[in-house]
Amino acid sequence: MIHSILLIGQSNMSGRGFPAEVEPIHNEKLFVLRNGRWQPMFVPVNPDRATAGTNLSESFADLYAKEHNVDVGIIPCADGGTCLDQWQVGSLLFDHACYMAELASRTSTIAAVLWHQGESDCEAYRYPLYQEKLTIILEAFRKKLNLQDVPFLLGGLGDYLPNYRKPNEFKNYVHINQALQNIAQTMPMTGYVPANGLLPNHDNLHFSAGALREFGVRYYQEFQKLEDKNKVFAEKSTPDNAIRTELEIL
Protein backbone atom coordinates (compact mmCIF):
# COMPACT_ATOMS: atom_id res chain seq x y z
CA MET A 1 0.00 0.00 0.00
CA ILE A 2 1.45 3.34 -1.08
CA HIS A 3 -0.10 6.64 -0.02
CA SER A 4 0.96 9.38 -2.41
CA ILE A 5 1.37 13.16 -2.24
CA LEU A 6 0.93 15.45 -5.24
CA LEU A 7 3.20 18.51 -5.42
CA ILE A 8 2.03 21.46 -7.54
CA GLY A 9 3.10 25.10 -7.73
CA GLN A 10 6.26 27.03 -8.54
CA SER A 11 9.87 27.12 -7.34
CA ASN A 12 9.30 27.10 -3.59
CA MET A 13 7.30 23.90 -4.03
CA SER A 14 9.97 22.52 -6.33
CA GLY A 15 12.45 23.33 -3.58
CA ARG A 16 15.55 25.50 -3.81
CA GLY A 17 17.10 24.69 -0.44
CA PHE A 18 20.78 23.73 -0.36
CA PRO A 19 20.91 20.04 0.69
CA ALA A 20 24.25 20.43 2.51
CA GLU A 21 22.57 22.75 5.03
CA VAL A 22 20.34 20.05 6.54
CA GLU A 23 20.67 16.47 7.68
CA PRO A 24 19.39 14.06 5.03
CA ILE A 25 16.20 12.16 5.77
CA HIS A 26 16.72 8.40 5.85
CA ASN A 27 13.43 6.54 5.64
CA GLU A 28 13.04 3.40 3.55
CA LYS A 29 9.29 4.01 3.31
CA LEU A 30 9.71 7.13 1.14
CA PHE A 31 9.52 6.96 -2.65
CA VAL A 32 9.33 9.32 -5.60
CA LEU A 33 7.59 8.75 -8.94
CA ARG A 34 9.89 8.42 -11.93
CA ASN A 35 8.77 7.15 -15.34
CA GLY A 36 5.58 5.78 -13.84
CA ARG A 37 7.37 3.70 -11.21
CA TRP A 38 8.39 4.29 -7.63
CA GLN A 39 12.00 4.53 -6.59
CA PRO A 40 13.52 5.36 -3.20
CA MET A 41 13.29 9.09 -2.52
CA PHE A 42 16.33 11.14 -3.45
CA VAL A 43 17.20 14.82 -3.61
CA PRO A 44 16.18 16.76 -5.59
CA VAL A 45 12.69 15.35 -5.32
CA ASN A 46 11.36 17.79 -7.93
CA PRO A 47 14.19 18.37 -10.47
CA ASP A 48 12.50 21.03 -12.58
CA ARG A 49 15.70 23.07 -12.81
CA ALA A 50 19.43 22.59 -12.28
CA THR A 51 18.96 24.68 -9.11
CA ALA A 52 16.45 22.26 -7.54
CA GLY A 53 17.35 21.08 -4.05
CA THR A 54 15.76 20.36 -0.70
CA ASN A 55 11.96 20.08 -0.85
CA LEU A 56 9.37 20.64 1.88
CA SER A 57 7.67 17.36 0.96
CA GLU A 58 10.62 15.42 2.40
CA SER A 59 9.79 16.23 6.02
CA PHE A 60 6.04 16.03 5.31
CA ALA A 61 6.35 12.54 3.84
CA ASP A 62 8.67 11.41 6.63
CA LEU A 63 6.14 12.41 9.29
CA TYR A 64 3.27 10.84 7.34
CA ALA A 65 5.09 7.54 6.88
CA LYS A 66 6.02 7.34 10.56
CA GLU A 67 2.53 8.14 11.84
CA HIS A 68 0.61 5.94 9.40
CA ASN A 69 3.24 3.19 9.04
CA VAL A 70 2.85 3.04 5.26
CA ASP A 71 5.00 3.64 2.21
CA VAL A 72 4.67 7.20 0.92
CA GLY A 73 5.17 8.19 -2.69
CA ILE A 74 5.82 11.75 -3.84
CA ILE A 75 4.45 12.90 -7.21
CA PRO A 76 6.58 15.93 -8.21
CA CYS A 77 4.82 18.29 -10.63
CA ALA A 78 5.90 21.78 -9.50
CA ASP A 79 7.56 24.09 -12.02
CA GLY A 80 9.63 27.11 -11.01
CA GLY A 81 8.77 30.61 -12.17
CA THR A 82 5.22 29.79 -13.22
CA CYS A 83 2.30 32.16 -12.78
CA LEU A 84 -1.25 31.08 -12.03
CA ASP A 85 -2.39 31.47 -15.64
CA GLN A 86 0.08 28.74 -16.60
CA TRP A 87 -1.79 26.39 -14.24
CA GLN A 88 -5.26 27.12 -15.59
CA VAL A 89 -7.51 24.22 -16.52
CA GLY A 90 -6.38 22.66 -19.80
CA SER A 91 -2.88 24.13 -19.63
CA LEU A 92 0.24 22.01 -20.07
CA LEU A 93 1.04 22.16 -16.35
CA PHE A 94 -2.49 21.29 -15.26
CA ASP A 95 -2.73 18.40 -17.70
CA HIS A 96 0.75 17.15 -16.82
CA ALA A 97 -0.06 17.11 -13.10
CA CYS A 98 -3.33 15.28 -13.77
CA TYR A 99 -1.59 12.75 -15.97
CA MET A 100 1.12 12.07 -13.39
CA ALA A 101 -1.44 11.82 -10.60
CA GLU A 102 -3.57 9.40 -12.61
CA LEU A 103 -0.51 7.33 -13.42
CA ALA A 104 0.50 7.25 -9.76
CA SER A 105 -3.06 6.30 -8.79
CA ARG A 106 -2.66 2.99 -10.59
CA THR A 107 -0.28 1.87 -7.84
CA SER A 108 -1.09 4.26 -4.97
CA THR A 109 -3.84 6.35 -3.41
CA ILE A 110 -3.43 10.12 -3.23
CA ALA A 111 -3.58 11.22 0.41
CA ALA A 112 -2.73 14.92 0.11
CA VAL A 113 -2.12 17.70 -2.39
CA LEU A 114 0.51 20.33 -1.53
CA TRP A 115 0.36 23.72 -3.26
CA HIS A 116 2.82 26.60 -3.07
CA GLN A 117 2.68 29.33 -5.67
CA GLY A 118 2.04 33.05 -5.88
CA GLU A 119 5.31 34.94 -6.12
CA SER A 120 4.76 35.26 -9.86
CA ASP A 121 1.30 36.75 -9.28
CA CYS A 122 2.27 39.62 -6.99
CA GLU A 123 2.04 42.16 -9.79
CA ALA A 124 -0.71 44.76 -9.45
CA TYR A 125 -2.68 43.47 -12.42
CA ARG A 126 -2.54 39.85 -11.27
CA TYR A 127 -3.11 39.58 -7.53
CA PRO A 128 -6.73 40.92 -7.50
CA LEU A 129 -7.85 37.89 -9.53
CA TYR A 130 -5.76 35.33 -7.66
CA GLN A 131 -8.46 33.99 -5.35
CA GLU A 132 -11.00 33.56 -8.12
CA LYS A 133 -8.56 31.88 -10.50
CA LEU A 134 -7.01 29.54 -7.94
CA THR A 135 -10.43 28.46 -6.70
CA ILE A 136 -11.33 27.35 -10.22
CA ILE A 137 -8.04 25.48 -10.60
CA LEU A 138 -8.28 23.65 -7.28
CA GLU A 139 -11.91 22.67 -7.85
CA ALA A 140 -10.93 21.33 -11.27
CA PHE A 141 -8.14 19.23 -9.77
CA ARG A 142 -10.57 17.79 -7.23
CA LYS A 143 -13.12 16.91 -9.89
CA LYS A 144 -10.67 15.56 -12.45
CA LEU A 145 -8.82 13.36 -9.95
CA ASN A 146 -11.82 12.56 -7.70
CA LEU A 147 -10.18 14.10 -4.63
CA GLN A 148 -13.21 15.55 -2.84
CA ASP A 149 -12.18 13.95 0.46
CA VAL A 150 -8.44 14.66 0.15
CA PRO A 151 -6.81 17.57 2.02
CA PHE A 152 -5.42 20.35 -0.16
CA LEU A 153 -2.78 22.40 1.65
CA LEU A 154 -1.95 25.93 0.51
CA GLY A 155 1.33 27.42 1.71
CA GLY A 156 1.79 31.12 2.35
CA LEU A 157 4.47 33.27 0.76
CA GLY A 158 7.52 34.16 2.85
CA ASP A 159 7.46 37.37 4.88
CA TYR A 160 11.07 37.98 3.82
CA LEU A 161 10.01 38.92 0.27
CA PRO A 162 10.18 42.70 0.92
CA ASN A 163 13.95 42.19 1.34
CA TYR A 164 14.32 41.00 -2.25
CA ARG A 165 16.80 43.03 -4.34
CA LYS A 166 13.86 44.71 -6.07
CA PRO A 167 11.82 45.86 -3.04
CA ASN A 168 8.61 46.52 -4.97
CA GLU A 169 8.67 43.23 -6.87
CA PHE A 170 6.71 41.36 -4.21
CA LYS A 171 5.10 44.16 -2.20
CA ASN A 172 1.67 42.62 -2.82
CA TYR A 173 2.57 39.23 -1.33
CA VAL A 174 0.27 39.94 1.63
CA HIS A 175 -2.69 40.03 -0.76
CA ILE A 176 -1.73 36.62 -2.15
CA ASN A 177 -1.53 35.25 1.38
CA GLN A 178 -4.94 36.70 2.20
CA ALA A 179 -6.40 35.11 -0.93
CA LEU A 180 -4.94 31.74 0.10
CA GLN A 181 -6.44 32.09 3.58
CA ASN A 182 -9.81 33.05 2.13
CA ILE A 183 -9.84 29.94 -0.04
CA ALA A 184 -8.90 27.73 2.90
CA GLN A 185 -11.75 29.20 4.95
CA THR A 186 -14.38 28.63 2.27
CA MET A 187 -13.31 25.48 0.41
CA PRO A 188 -13.95 22.14 2.14
CA MET A 189 -10.91 19.99 3.00
CA THR A 190 -8.53 22.87 2.34
CA GLY A 191 -6.00 24.34 4.75
CA TYR A 192 -3.68 27.33 4.86
CA VAL A 193 -0.08 26.89 6.02
CA PRO A 194 1.60 30.12 7.22
CA ALA A 195 5.22 30.81 6.35
CA ASN A 196 5.76 33.44 9.05
CA GLY A 197 9.33 33.62 10.30
CA LEU A 198 10.78 31.11 7.86
CA LEU A 199 14.20 32.15 6.58
CA PRO A 200 15.26 32.50 2.93
CA ASN A 201 18.37 31.73 0.96
CA HIS A 202 20.62 34.72 0.29
CA ASP A 203 18.42 35.60 -2.70
CA ASN A 204 15.51 36.53 -0.39
CA LEU A 205 13.26 34.71 -2.84
CA HIS A 206 13.48 31.02 -1.96
CA PHE A 207 13.12 29.30 1.39
CA SER A 208 16.33 27.92 2.87
CA ALA A 209 16.76 24.19 3.37
CA GLY A 210 16.15 24.52 7.11
CA ALA A 211 13.04 26.58 6.48
CA LEU A 212 11.73 23.97 4.06
CA ARG A 213 12.17 21.27 6.68
CA GLU A 214 10.08 23.37 9.08
CA PHE A 215 7.58 24.27 6.37
CA GLY A 216 7.01 20.58 5.67
CA VAL A 217 6.26 20.07 9.36
CA ARG A 218 3.77 22.93 9.27
CA TYR A 219 2.11 21.47 6.19
CA TYR A 220 1.78 18.16 8.01
CA GLN A 221 0.34 19.77 11.13
CA GLU A 222 -2.33 21.41 8.99
CA PHE A 223 -2.94 18.09 7.23
CA GLN A 224 -3.58 16.44 10.59
CA LYS A 225 -6.39 18.92 11.25
CA LEU A 226 -8.13 17.97 8.01
CA GLU A 227 -7.55 14.26 7.49
CA ASP A 228 -10.26 11.74 8.20
CA LYS A 229 -8.69 9.50 10.83
CA ASN A 230 -11.19 6.75 9.98
CA LYS A 231 -10.65 6.84 6.23
CA VAL A 232 -10.05 3.42 4.73
CA PHE A 233 -7.76 3.47 1.72
CA ALA A 234 -8.68 1.12 -1.10
CA GLU A 235 -6.13 -1.60 -1.68
CA LYS A 236 -4.11 -0.98 -4.83
CA SER A 237 -2.18 -3.76 -6.47
CA THR A 238 1.51 -2.96 -6.83
CA PRO A 239 2.97 -4.94 -9.73
CA ASP A 240 6.41 -6.38 -9.16
CA ASN A 241 7.95 -3.83 -11.51
CA ALA A 242 6.14 -0.79 -10.03
CA ILE A 243 8.88 -0.29 -7.45
CA ARG A 244 12.42 -0.19 -8.77
CA THR A 245 14.84 -2.75 -7.45
CA GLU A 246 18.15 -1.81 -5.86
CA LEU A 247 19.97 -2.93 -9.01
CA GLU A 248 17.78 -0.77 -11.26
CA ILE A 249 18.61 2.31 -9.20
CA LEU A 250 22.29 2.09 -10.07
What positions do the PLM features span?
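Cell-envelope and extracellular/periplasmic
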Residues: 1-250
